[in-house]
């Protein structure tokens, strides 16, 4: 029987600002069986894609990506904010509601031709994941799939990821 993962998501109105419904994954992470089952769902999605590396953006992409990489017996590379990686990096900028941000990946994190799964907790507007994909591709990696615990459908992030395979465990 399939797990109803939505019962492990806390919906917090007006956070971080009025009019926003925040979807908190903390209860899912706090329940070992549910978190393991959610990880297994993403692993099942990725199994037939010959994934060789998982990449996730700071910070909740680490929470999703690391256990997936562990279960698959492959590596994980973190896409971080400025100043967080100690060696030579590549950079991808993306738009925020007011301004811009950027993510960085070590230049040697991805080998040319390496098949990569990009993971995050949430697909909203697609900006963060779009930048993460750009980093992977700038290094010659091939994004064979993207996986999320939650997709906020009203924000149309899927539209920014046209041409990429998208898996989301829950949709709101």
From Swiss-Prot:
GO terms for cellular component: cytoplasm. One of its GO terms (biological process) is AMP salvage. SUPFAM superfamilies: PRTase-like. It catalyses: AMP + diphosphate = 5-phospho-alpha-D-ribose 1-diphosphate + adenine. It is found in: Cytoplasm. Pathway: Purine metabolism; AMP biosynthesis via salvage pathway; AMP from adenine: step 1/1. Its EC number is 2.4.2.7. It holds the Pfam family Pribosyltran. GO terms for molecular function: adenine binding; adenine phosphoribosyltransferase activity; AMP binding. Keywords: Cytoplasm, Glycosyltransferase, Purine salvage, Transferase. It comes from the Bacteria. Homodimer. Catalyzes a salvage reaction resulting in the formation of AMP, that is energically less costly than de novo synthesis. Belongs to the purine/pyrimidine phosphoribosyltransferase family. This is Adenine phosphoribosyltransferase. The gene is apt.
């Amino acid at each position: 029987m399939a797990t109803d993962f939505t019962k492990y998501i806390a919906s917090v109105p007006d956070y971080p600002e009025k009019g926003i419904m925040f979807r908190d994954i903390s209860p899912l992470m706090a329940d070992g069986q549910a978190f393991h089952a959610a990880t297994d769902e993403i692993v099942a999605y990725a199994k037939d894609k010959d994934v060789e590396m998982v990449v996730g953006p700071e910070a909740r992409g680490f929470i999703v990506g690391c256990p997936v990489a562990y279960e698959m017996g492959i590596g994980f590379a973190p896409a971080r904010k400025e100043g967080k990686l100690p060696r030579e990096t590549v950079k991808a900028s993306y738009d925020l509601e007011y301004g811009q941000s950027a993510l960085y990946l070590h230049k040697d994190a991805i080998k040319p031709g390496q098949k990569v799964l990009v993971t995050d907790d949430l697909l909203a507007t697609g900006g963060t994941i779009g930048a993460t994909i750009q980093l992977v591709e700038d290094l010659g990696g091939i994004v064979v799939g993207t996986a999320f615990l939650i997709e906020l459908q009203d924000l149309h992030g899927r539209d920014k990821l046209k041409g990429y395979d998208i898996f989301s465990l829950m949709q709101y």
